Amino acid sequence: MKYILSLDQGTTSSRAVIFDKNANIKGFAKKEFKQIYPHPSWVEHDPNEIWGSLLGVMAEALANARTFPNNIEAIGITNQRETTIIWDRNTGHPIYNAIVWQDRRTAQLCDELKSKGKDKIFLQKTGLVLDAYFSGTKIKWILDNVAGARKRAEKGELCFGTIDTWIVWNLTKGKIHITDYSNASRTLLLNIKSLKWDCDLLQILDIPKSLLPELKQSSEVYGKTDASALGTEIIISGIAGDQFAATFGQACLQKGMAKNTYGTGCFVTVNIGKKPIINEQKILTSIAWGRKNSITYVFEGSVFIGGAVIQWLRDNLELFRKSGDAEAVAASVDNNGGIYFVPAFVGLGTPHWDPYARGMIIGLTRSSTKEHITRAALESIALQSFDVLTEMQNSIQEFEIKELRVDGGASKNNLLMQFQADILQCNVVRPKITETTALGSAYLAGLAVGYWESAEEITSLWKSDKIFEPSMEKSKREDLIYNWNKAIKRAKAWI
């Protein structure tokens, strides 16, 4: 039997997932890797450790599936977006650590560019706000701060890539230097209307075009792996940034369909169809995928700290031993005890876009307990997502967001999902397969080689596991939102 192998390279771990034709998981492996924090608000990864982790999980997933590499029809890749790597074109060695999407070191540069009115140019061309979140200013920082980097880049000696590009480069032993439209749309360098690297934006950031990878569809045959990676040559035929892969995996293929991925951060996407809508209200517009020479666009809202707030309570405050314990701890109290937790550890994303906000726990009294704090932390994940969806709905006049499909690790938390439905006042639907990010890239890869025949077949494979319906009293909901908004205002512009 033939399978599709999906490589899901995330912010804190690398996964390999093997799917069959019915979207059943036949093999799975996961490996965490080191988070590097050189300075406050700086976040880095070791690119070589990431590649090593992928080699490990590929072999382990194949072993768990009790199959061999020659039974893999194709490989799909999905990845943490915006995270930036620059490496030597000849040796393949990175010249600096990967600068992670959460990293805020270029916030001041973004402010300087905004003061010159450049943010409006970036918004109209890329659909993005001018923020340290995206790859463009990270590339500039490396070129400006690593000795000799700019000269080498101008000579064509260096390659830039987001994580997908780095994976394909290594899988093919440097033969292929590509990215797909979805990842490219998060760099601040792609014109999402012309579908080309934009020379004006490259000039503003002083980035040589020779650094950049070739642009590709999200579902097409790019080439084959080098035999050294898995012992045989395998077709690589799907690439999408993690949130866009999850949108595809959730079968949100029609205009108006929405999903939220609860991972390290939370990422809400709404399918807006085949034409980009540039939103002035701080909602991002991105390319979700390119397939059959057609582009699908989404609105996206990004919450920087979602499930990571639970990780922080576990590791930094040691309130519980395992992240999975958070639900039981939070459920042991009926409410948050008047506590509101704004986890702005690296600033606030959509719709606030405040890099100078910082984390805050407010409302503490002598009767406050770790249970109240844990519940407030869980609620903060849903409340931040509520802010995003409210802004999106206000920006979309032609259709109503009627349900939210959910995935990611924290979507398994029933207390959180019920609270999300209550706050949103709409159904929250969890699918049977919650590894939707990996599944989406598998679908894109499989469609390119005929493993699956059509988008309609993908839609038919999606199955609901549980529907959470809103049940909270109106007055209680309004109080929670009112106090949350007060807390957000206090956390803003802290530094």
Swiss-Prot record:
Q: Which GO terms describe its cellular component?
A: cytosol
- GO terms of molecular function: ATP binding; glycerol kinase activity
Catalyzed reactions: glycerol + ATP = sn-glycerol 3-phosphate + ADP + H(+)
Residues that bind ADP: 11, 15, 264, 307, 409, 413
Write the Enzyme Commission number(s) for this entry: 2.7.1.30
The main enzyme category here is transferase
Where is ATP bound in this sequence?
11-13, 264, 307, 311, 409
Q: Which UniProt keywords apply?
A: ATP-binding, Glycerol metabolism, Kinase, Nucleotide-binding, Transferase
Listed under GO biological process in this entry are: glycerol catabolic process; glycerol metabolic process; glycerol-3-phosphate metabolic process
The cross-references to Pfam families, in alphabetical order and at most eight, read: FGGY_C (PF02782), FGGY_N (PF00370)
Residues where sn-glycerol 3-phosphate binds: 11, 81-82, 133, 242
Documented activity regulation: Inhibited by fructose 1,6-bisphosphate (FBP).
Q: What pathway or pathways are given for this protein in its record?
A: Polyol metabolism; glycerol degradation via glycerol kinase pathway; sn-glycerol 3-phosphate from glycerol: step 1/1
Give the matching InterPro entries.
Answer: ATPase_NBD, Carb_kinase_FGGY, Carb_kinase_FGGY_CS, FGGY_C, FGGY_N, Glycerol_kin
Where glycerol is bound, by residue? Answer: 81-82, 133, 242-243
What the entry lists under NCBIfam families is as follows: glycerol_kin, PRK00047.1
Q: Which PANTHER family does UniProt cross-reference here?
A: GLYCEROL KINASE, SUGAR KINASE
Q: Which family does it belong to?
A: Belongs to the FGGY kinase family.
User: What role is this protein assigned?
Assistant: Key enzyme in the regulation of glycerol uptake and metabolism. Catalyzes the phosphorylation of glycerol to yield sn-glycerol 3-phosphate.
What name appears for this protein in its UniProt entry?
Glycerol kinase
Q: What is the lineage of its organism?
A: Bacteria, Pseudomonadati, Spirochaetota, Spirochaetia, Spirochaetales
